[in-house]
Every structure is written in structure tokens, then in C-alpha cells.
Amino acid sequence: MAFSRLSFAASLIVFSSLIISSVAYYGNEADPETGKLIPIAVEGIIKCKSGGKTYPIQGATARIACVKVDAYGNELVPISILSSKTDAKGYFIATIFPSQLRAGRTVTKCKTYLYKSPLADCDFPTDVNKGVRGQPLSTYRILQDKSFKLYWAGPFFYTSEPTYY
């Protein structure tokens, strides 16, 4: 009986920590050396899946949308930015700098979406890795020079045929 209560308590603690981490605030972590807020960056890959082939799309863009939060924790209007156009390997990057927000504001609940494909024969977005519904940002790494919190999104896919969800 005591063991089941202990395991229930442990499960409750783990579950609550998962909930807390799922509503993470992005871009509000200060560099311990300078005290300045660290910008966030999102990188990923966008590809075309047509028939049995998959290949990177050059010139595609992704959209990153976040909710702004004030110093009191109140959610404000969302912020949305577009990534750079993908390179020949389908790679994109987007950044949100603290200077894009008013003082005392941070962002939360960030998601990455497919935005635009330049290919007329591969321009239907798919929901693979939540490219249509939005993939929440979760794990990140801080770059060595502490200049960015770097998140990974995708890979995302467009297709030549419409997909209905």
C-alpha cells in the first residue's frame, strides 16, 4: 500500500513537471555573464514528397508564431515572423530578438508552421511533423558563444497532391 502511494506521488511530480515545461517561456533566459536576454532561433528543413521521391525545396519559407506575455504573465497579441528562404538543402532559420519585443515582455507557446513553397508542382502543405497545425518548440541548445537558444523544427513536407485532414 505504501509503495503504491509512493509511486502515485512520484508519478504526480513527474507529470506536473511535464506540464510546467510544456508552457515554457522562450527568449527570456538571460546570459549569466552579461545579464542580457538571449534571442531564440529556429532552424529546420522543408522538403517535397512527390510519389516515392523526397527532395529539399529551395526558396520555401516557414512561419513561427508565438504569444507575447507581459511582465505580469498576461498573454497579449501574438507575434509572427517568417524564416529566411530555404537554401538548396531545404534548410531555413528564423530568429526572434528581445529587441523585437517591448521591455518586460517575453514570448511563449511558440509553434512553427509551413508557410510557402515556390514550387507549383509541390505546393500542398502536409501535416507531417505538424507542419499545418504547428509544431511546438520544445528542446533547444544554447550555442557555444551564448548568442542564441537554438530550436529545431521539422522536417516539414509539401506534396504535389492535396491532403485533407
From Swiss-Prot:
What phenotype has been reported when the gene encoding this protein is knocked out?
No visible phenotype under normal conditions. Short and abnormally shaped root hairs due to the suppression of cell growth and cell death, and withered seeds, both having a tendency to necrotize and thick cell walls with abnormal structure in phosphate (Pi) deficient conditions or after ethylene treatment. Production of dark brown shrunken seeds unable to germinate, especially in low humidity.
**Main subcellular location of this protein, as a coarse class:** secreted
Q: Which UniProt keywords apply?
A: Cell wall, Developmental protein, Ethylene signaling pathway, Secreted, Signal, Stress response
Gene induction: Accumulates in root hairs within five days under phosphate (Pi) deficient conditions (at protein level).
Residues annotated as signal peptide: 1-24
Compartments in which it is found? Secreted, Cell wall
Keyword set includes GTP-binding: no
Task: From the UniProt record, give one GO term of the biological process aspect.
Answer: plant-type cell wall biogenesis
A single Pfam family it belongs to is Pollen_Ole_e_1
Q: Give tissue specificity per the record.
A: Root hair and seed specific expression. Also observed in other tissues including siliques, roots and flowers.
What is a single cellular component term in the Gene Ontology annotation? extracellular region
Quote the function comment for this protein: Contributes to cell wall structure in root hairs and seeds, especially in phosphate (Pi) deprivation conditions or in the presence of ethylene. Particularly important in maternal tissues (pericarps and seed coats) during seed development, especially under stress conditions. Confers thermotolerance in seed germination rate.
Q: Which family does it belong to?
A: Belongs to the plant proline-rich protein superfamily.
Q: What is this protein called?
A: Protein SEED AND ROOT HAIR PROTECTIVE PROTEIN
